[in-house]
Structures are given as C-alpha cells and as structure tokens.
C-alpha cells in the first residue's frame, strides 16, 4: 500500500508541474534533506540528514558542483563527506552523483571506506527557495541504503 501511495504521489508531481518552467539562474544553492532510512544495517528505520552546497556552472547553471555531508542517526554513526555533481532539468527534477568517504563506527573504532550516492529530487520553486520530495541511494562496500525524504533549498 505504501508503494502505491508513493507511486501515485510521484506521478502526480510529474504531471502537475509538466507545464511549469523552472528557473535555475541562481549561482549558489544551500540544501538540506531529511528523511527516513528504512532498515539500515539490519536496524529499524532511522532518520537521515543530508546537507549540501552547490555552485552553479554553465550558461544557465544547469550543472553544479559542490560538497555534500550525509549522516544516518543510527548505532554505527554513519557519516559521509562527498564531492557533489548535479544537473537541473527544465521540468524541475535534479539528479546528483556524490562520490566520497564514509566514516562509520564499529566496535569503538572508526572505519573509513569509499562511498557513492545517487540522488533525485523535484523542486517546487518559491522565489529564492525550493522544496520537494527526494530519494537518496547510497552504495558502500558492505551495504546499500536509501532515504526517502523532503529536500529544502535556498538559492542565492
């Protein structure tokens, strides 16, 4: 039932905004996403937090590059720092790829390993702010996780 509601919500967003022209002329963005990370590391659901800064590049700032920090509030103190590349589509969707370093605590020691994240979010624009749904998928050596949440950005 939850998947059906999620699917209907996503399709509703896609078709309700298909005629809306999005403006990505801003040169900088500070964004935050908060969401649920289901079943991470065989635990129950956890809260995830994602912060990023992106500098727009190109004629209309459709592309961007920046830095990203992610944390999952779980028993293992899952934290990552990544370089972030983004592309803004004219229909309001943004995709991002973020390779970086994961820091995770196990048995009192901090382990480091390569991580990568793929993100997809939709922007409802409100002057210099935007808000919308986001999905974030993370791949590490030992596991894959995803976060379903809400993205909020400030454009300047």
Describe the predicted segments one by one.
Residues 1-26, 156:
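Cleavable N-terminal export/targeting peptides
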Residues 17-71:
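Short glycine/proline- and aromatic-enriched beta-strand/turn motifs that initiate or cap beta-hairpins
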Residues 26-28, 43-49, 77-81, 103, ...:
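Residues that define the transmembrane beta-barrel architecture of outer-membrane proteins
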Residues 28, 59-65, 92-95, 123-132:
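Repeated loop/turn-to-beta-strand initiation elements of outer-membrane beta-barrel proteins
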Residues 32-38, 65-71, 83-85, 97-101, ...:
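Transmembrane beta-barrel strands of outer-membrane/channel proteins
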Residues 38-42, 59, 71-77, 91, ...:
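Gram-negative outer-membrane beta-barrel proteins
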Residues 55, 85-87, 122-124, 137, ...:
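Residue-level signature of outer-membrane beta-barrel architecture
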Residues 118-124, 144-156:
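Outer-membrane beta-barrel "beta-signal"
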